Design a protein with these regions (language model features):
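Flexible, D/E/H-enriched segments
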Residues: 1-30, 41, 63-158
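Short catalytic/ligand-binding loop motif for oxyanion handling, primarily in non-cytosolic enzymes
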Residues: 57-62
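Charged, low-complexity intrinsically disordered segments
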Residues: 151-206
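Beta-strand elements within well-structured catalytic alpha/beta cores of enzymes
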Residues: 13, 46-56
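Hydrophobic alpha-helical segments and helix-packing faces
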Residues: 24, 28-32, 46, 69, ...
Length: 206
């Protein structure tokens, strides 16, 4: 909504990294690679910003509470830019040893980096360690070339393969994004009828 607080659509990806078992670094990297494929498969010429969050080195429990490792944080940010595969191959225990157990949540940054090409330009980097966790802001510009159109078309066919022909079945309506959005609006309207003021407006309009 161009008139809203965000100049575009926001699609959140939530990753649980607090209660174990949590995803591996490699799994989140693969999610990022798949996200890139999905973005490239859109027929529209989209402008997309991929954002990631997660505290750098910190630990908030046990005798190691208050742990901070700014040297590791600097190394992590450098590897994220230049050699992300080194981070992909690390185990959660290695992240915990270097950056604290809660600091292992930086693996979420690998979704963002996985969605970018190998060729990125560092636009901005700043770190600040005010108390029990290091904070960083990092901005990359993706310099990767245009996607291979044959590969994009093959991916589109792959996505549609499982449902191909289902929409032609009589009385069958696959829940597409458009239908889901329409149903959400209807369900929101119906749910809001529990609110007296909304119900009164409905009765008056009816």
């Amino acid at each position: 909504d161009e008139t809203g607080p965000w100049p575009g659509r926001v699609v959140p990806l939530q990753v649980g990294v607090l209660q174990f078992p949590i995803p591996s670094a490699k799994r989140l990297w693969k999610l990022g690679r798949t996200l890139r494929k999905a973005i490239e498969s859109y027929p529209e010429d989209l402008n997309v910003a991929v954002m990631a969050t997660g505290g750098l080195s910190h630990q908030v429990h046990g005798e190691r509470a208050g742990f901070l490792n700014e040297a590791w944080d600097a190394e992590f940010l450098d590897l994220l830019e230049k050699a992300p595969q080194a981070l992909v191959n690390m185990r959660i225990a290695e992240y915990a040893a270097k950056g604290g157990l809660e600091g292992a949540e930086v693996i979420m940054w690998l979704i963002m980096r996985g969605a970018l090409s190998d060729n990125v330009r560092l636009v901005h980097k700043q770190t600040y360690a005010p108390s029990v966790t290091n904070i960083a802001t990092l901005v990359f510009d993706d310099l990767g070339g245009e996607p291979d159109q044959a590969a994009v078309e093959a991916y589109r066919r792959h996505i549609g393969h499982e449902l191909e022909g289902a929409s032609a079945l009589p009385g069958t309506y696959p829940l597409t994004h458009a239908r889901s959005h329409a149903n959400l609006r209807i369900n929101t309207f119906l749910h809001d009828l529990v609110k007296p003021e909304h119900r009164a407006r409905f009765v008056d309009d009816f």
